[in-house]
């Protein structure tokens, strides 16, 4: 028997999977949010949690010179992001991985910027803050 969370996930992807974005946002809103981040290294290491198929990941690649690790639980979205990264010329800067944003299997304090555009609500604020400040 599936849980309500399983049902929500299935329903979410039925509705949003084929769309270019799986949540709110735009290149302009990403640029504005980045302007509030303060000074980043010239080539920042960015973690994009809950990246979906990567619309905001590409905005980050366009707006920074950084290397981006894009993480999402949905394998189909990650495959789409991998293919699009290569076709758009970002294959060396974007590494798309399947993983759990509530428990990313990544070394703590290894990123200059943690980004999550319209996804953290899925794990709750307390968990999201724990991920950002381990």
Predicted regions located by residue number:
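Class I SAM-dependent methyltransferase SAM/SAH-binding core
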Residues: 47, 53-103
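Class I SAM-dependent methyltransferase Rossmann-like catalytic core
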Residues: 12-24
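A short SAM/SAH-binding and catalytic strip from SAM-dependent methyltransferases
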Residues: 113-126
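A short glycine-rich, Lys/Arg-flanked "PGG" loop and its adjoining helix->strand segment in the class I
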Residues: 127-134
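Conserved alpha-helix/loop element of class I SAM-dependent methyltransferases that forms part
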Residues: 23-42
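A short acidic, Gly/Pro-enriched loop at the edge of an enzyme's catalytic core
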Residues: 102-113
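N-terminal, positively charged/glycine-rich alpha-helical extensions of SAM-dependent methyltransferases
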Residues: 1-14
């Amino acid at each position: 028997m599936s849980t309500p969370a399983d049902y929500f996930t299935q329903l979410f992807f039925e509705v949003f999977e084929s769309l270019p974005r799986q949540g709110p946002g735009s290149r302009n809103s990403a640029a504005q949010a980045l302007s509030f981040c303060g000074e980043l290294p010239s080539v920042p290491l960015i973690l994009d949690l809950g990246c979906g198929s990567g619309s905001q990941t590409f905005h980050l690649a366009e707006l920074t010179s950084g290397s981006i690790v894009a993480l999402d639980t949905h394998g189909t979205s990650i495959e789409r992001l991998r293919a699009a990264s290569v076709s758009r010329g970002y294959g060396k800067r974007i590494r798309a991985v399947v993983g759990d944003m509530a428990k990313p299997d990544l070394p703590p304090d290894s990123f200059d910027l943690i980004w999550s555009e319209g996804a953290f609500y899925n794990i709750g604020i307390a968990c999201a803050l724990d991920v950002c400040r381990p």
